[in-house]
Amino acid sequence: MKIITLTTDFGLRDYSVGAVKGAIYTKCPDARIVDISHLVSPFDIFQTAYILKNAYKHFPEGSIHVIGVDAERNPEKRHLLMLLNGHYFIGADNGIFNLLAEENEPIQLFEVATDIPITLFPTLNVFPSVVEKVYKGLSPEQIGVPTDKYLRATHFNPEVSSDEAFIYGVIIYIDHYGNAVSNISRSLFERIQQNRKFEVIFKMFSFRKIYNQYSDIINFNCPPESRATPDGEGMLLFNDLNYLQFSIYKSDRRSVGGASSLFGMDYYDRVSVHFF
């Protein structure tokens, strides 16, 4: 029994998610459908890639991943099936596929052959038929035509100054807690740092310490009754994906706020690290 995942920008209010699931169950009654996210910002393939890339690896090989973001077919945007690390991905040729793969990671792409006319809702009217073919064991070559031509979206890669005194990055994701994740990886940070001191700068805010985990901000040497509460304090750490992350300890976007709101951070805002 293969697992089928859904990643879309449909939200949870409308009929769309339920309709897609119904169409898939009609064709694959014993399937297991897993929702990865339906709250992707509309048409944002970079946000889609961050979520799906870091989720799919935890599913068993052979899983089928449906990408319902910016999926409408047109003369310049085909529907593709990708085979990557034993996983199948179905979506539109909008730049998403190379974002899902690591640098220089081999991928196989197939243009999906379909006699279904252009539709406003391909995730419902086209993709379930492709899912069915993969689910029932057809090879990618039986489903589509191999192609090496596809749209390559530009990665938001951090930049290092020529004297290696600075790393310049951007915010690539804001999560449910308001944590703002940059594209600066731990490996890049440590390679450039070389045991030097550092200052992480965003607008008027600066940080000179990176914590290993959230609770490290608590002074456990101080008795609880006389200990200052760190709730709502800003902090830096490398998240579980090893990207530099701006956080608020025990953030609640409804009360104390998250890093994105309190620091005024938004997608693709610039951050820098100064080594000295």
PLM regions and their residue ranges:
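Short, basic/aromatic-enriched C-terminal tail that caps enzymatic domains
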Residues: 3, 263-276
